[in-house]
Amino acid sequence: MNWRRLGGAWLVALAMILCAWAEAPWVNHVTDAERAQINPYAHQAEAIAAGAKLFADHCAKCHGSDALGRRKRPSLRTAEVQRAADGEIFWMLKNGDLRHGMPSWSALPEPTRWQIIAYVKSLGESAPAKAIPVGIKK
């Protein structure tokens, strides 16, 4: 048996597995324990207000001040984001996804990250109201 050929086949197989893992959606990398984390600041008005300021300082550059997304960055008001477990969003803030332009915010203290999540979750799928120009009937 040709051990070099067998070794080469194993390397190719390993490379394929690693590539498939790297290309998997980020949510597949979240462990059950991480996913089960619950935001200690959920639905707290003070935390949501603090999260809004933090969002403006750290997130609005890419996701837009209205969180509807900009420059090919995703909206955070979508049903997918709003249905995501708090722990999944926390994982993303902690780890980021540089392949898609999302930096890690692990340098921010945990309470700060949870406040940002409380704010994002408070947005729901609602979009800011658009003014109807004068003279236009609805």
Predicted regions and their residues:
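Gly/Gly-Pro-rich "capping" loops immediately C-terminal to redox-active cysteine motifs
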Residues: 41-52, 64-94
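Residue-level signal for mature regions of secreted extracellular proteins and peptides
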Residues: 15, 52-55
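Generic anion/oxyanion-binding catalytic loop in active/binding sites
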Residues: 11, 40, 78, 102-105
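Flexible coil segments in periplasmic/lumen-exposed cytochrome c-class electron-transfer proteins
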Residues: 25-38, 56, 100-138
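N-terminal export/targeting leaders of redox proteins
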Residues: 1-45, 134-138
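Short cysteine clusters
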Residues: 59-62
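N-terminal alpha-helical segment
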Residues: 33-34, 69-72, 98
